[in-house]
Amino acid sequence: MSVFTAVSFEQMQQWLKGYDLGELLDLQGIASGITNTNYFVATGTGRYVLTLFEEHSAEELPNFLDLMTHLAERGIPCPYPVKNIAGQALGELNGKPAALVSCLAGKSLDNPSPQHCAAIGEVLARMHLAGASFEVSIINLRCQRWRIARLPRWAPFLDAENXRMLDAQLEFEQAFDTSALSRGVIHADLFRDNVLMDGDKVGGVLDFYYAWNDVLFYDIAIAVXDWCVNADGTRDVGRVRAFLDAYHAVRPLTEEEHAAWPGMLRVAGIRFWLSRLNDLHFPQAGELIHAKDPAYFERILRKAIAAREQLLTMWVDS
């Protein structure tokens, strides 16, 4: 959630005239994150988060805002989109699509405990169940075709060893069979910096703007690779099991998902390794930029490749 498009106090005052939220009291840019422009907004009626969308078109965004509304109304701790006086949740500010959502309690964690991992596992399972009644299907914007199309621009930044690993992983992903796995709407970016923890409870799940319909277990693999991983890329057994046990208690995991577990971690690893590589070497212009190190996900991917049998033992108690 970096600041790429500046918004002045006066511009925000003018924009808020379209809302019934009272007087603007404070406006602060949010430096963390890598894709959209975000500000904390304080008014006479409370605190909100303003997002200016740097990549999505206005036509794409209503599905994401509708999903957030759908989940929030079913008890999932996620931001609730605020509608303006015309009844619209999406507007435009400084030439960019813009939305205002509720500001939730809590803070992101650098070093989550097993209790924190259990809390986010439980919320993710509830989110998957709540999303089953969301009737809109959202298309994946960063699928394998997206990665393959960008291989020529990434090639100069890969040494020979990484280029061989990339070729092998793309071949693996293409052959990876997920037809027996449950599908639905997934968050697809459930990293620690997209979750607010309020004590040992989840205060808020943020940034649904890369959600899409896919294999539910892919969401688990993405989250585990950030919440339950040590600095060297190895999985922390206690945190992994706490996450999976809590998820399983809400939406029971299947034997097919168990068999797919090591492979799904590889698929998640390659996506984020290449996405971070892209964001590092081809950044958007902006005032406050925060790019994440692709080497972190390179390590996670390598460990997932090397530790298949060990990963199969990191599973729920049956």
Swiss-Prot record:
It catalyses: L-homoserine + ATP = O-phospho-L-homoserine + ADP + H(+). It holds the Pfam family APH. One of its GO terms (biological process) is threonine biosynthetic process. Keywords: Amino-acid biosynthesis, ATP-binding, Kinase, Nucleotide-binding, Threonine biosynthesis, Transferase. Its EC number is 2.7.1.39. GO terms for molecular function: ATP binding; homoserine kinase activity. Belongs to the pseudomonas-type ThrB family. This is Homoserine kinase. It comes from Methylobacillus glycogenes. The gene is thrB.
